[in-house]
Amino acid sequence: MRNLGSKKSLFMKKIIQTSEAPAAIGPYSQAIESGNILFVSGQIPISPKEGKIVSTTIAEQTEQVFSNIEAILKSAGYSFQQVVKTTVFLTDMSHFATMNEVYKKYFTENCPARSTIAVKELPQGALVEIELIATK
C-alpha cells in the first residue's frame, strides 16, 4: 500500500494485478483498492493468454471484457454483486442491445448504476470497453 497524501492522510491505495487479465497497455494499473473501494480500469477484449483482441463480434468482445473484469475482481477479493457503478464505452451505439444481452448475464438483480458512452474509437480497434467501481 502507498500513502496518497500527507502523513496525516488516511487514504491508502493497493495496486491490484493479476496474470488472469491482460496487462495494462499503458501507464496505469488493472485496478486500485483504496479502503473498501475497488476502482477497475477500463477493460478491452484482450485475451490475457494471446495478448490480442479476441474477436470482431460485439458479443464475444463483451464476454472477454467481463472475463477480464471477473479475474480482476476475484484477485482483489470482490465479486460482481459488489459492483456499484459501471461505465461502458461503445464505438457504435447499434451494438448497445447485443452488449446489453451479455451485460445482464453478470448483473441480474440489484444492478449497479451505469453510463454508456459512444466514443470514436478504442485502443487496438476494440468495440467495447468497460470500467467499474466495487465496494465491500
Regions found by a protein language model. Give the residues of each.
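Short, polar/acidic, helix-capping and beta-turn segments at strand->helix junctions
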Residues: 11-136
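Short, Lys/Arg-enriched N-terminal segments with co-localized hydrophobic residues
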Residues: 2-11
